[in-house]
Amino acid sequence: MVVLVEASPRGGAGDHPASCELDAGGDVGSGGRQYAAVVVGGTFDRLHQGHHLFLKAAAEFARERIVIGICDGPMLAKKQASRMYAYLIQPIEKRMENVKEYIKAMIASYHFQSIKPDLEVHVEPIVDPFGPSIVDEALEAIIVSKETLPGGLAVNRKRAERGLAQLEIEVVELVPEKSTGNKISSTAFRKKEAERELHKQQQEAPHEQAVELECRI
């Protein structure tokens, strides 16, 4: 049975530096390479197929423990200042719960027997760029995408400064969206939600104006 260890929202640090948006997943499979403890990080907003594949690939690299950091606090503030629709990012509690539920379902499924049933899973918020990735001596690898590879390199530089062993960096390929050829993106989902809300408001506006006119008459 998977052991899920949850840190309280806004009460922990994080794992994945530089870029916290793991918006797409990858070609699943560790190629037989495994590490006692691995770390991954991301926003994990509106958990989608890309996230699923990325988490599965990361879990396959883990022999005993996987730490999953989810962006919150100052990390989200940076995203909201630089990206459209970032204000629609789900609350940290919702994103943490979605990740936990997916991990539990994944390990319980017979399709995912390559993942150890007793894998220890830590789910915690990220409130700074590095968090436990530069203090946890037991970590052996960090799982990244091509986009977040610079973050993995930054972690190793910080670990070197602190006299800690370097982490192996495993890069998971991104999965393109079939319809567009682009990567699967949480930002795209937020954009669609914003457009639906705008369309709804535009449809309701004439009705509200008519009601106001009737009241005046």
UniProtKB/Swiss-Prot annotation:
Inhibited by CoA. Keywords: ATP-binding, Coenzyme A biosynthesis, Nucleotide-binding, Nucleotidyltransferase, Transferase. Coiled coil: none annotated. GO terms for biological process: coenzyme A biosynthetic process. It catalyses: (R)-4'-phosphopantetheine + ATP + H(+) = 3'-dephospho-CoA + diphosphate. GO terms for molecular function: ATP binding; dephospho-CoA kinase activity; pantetheine-phosphate adenylyltransferase activity. CDD domains: PPAT_CoAS (cd02164). InterPro entries: Cyt_trans-like, Rossmann-like_a/b/a_fold. The keyword Repressor does not apply. Its EC number is 2.7.7.3. Pathway: Cofactor biosynthesis; coenzyme A biosynthesis; CoA from (R)-pantothenate: step 4/5. Reversibly transfers an adenylyl group from ATP to 4'-phosphopantetheine, yielding dephospho-CoA (dPCoA) and pyrophosphate. Does not accept 4'-phosphopantothenoylcysteine as a substrate. Belongs to the eukaryotic CoaD family. This is Phosphopantetheine adenylyltransferase 2.
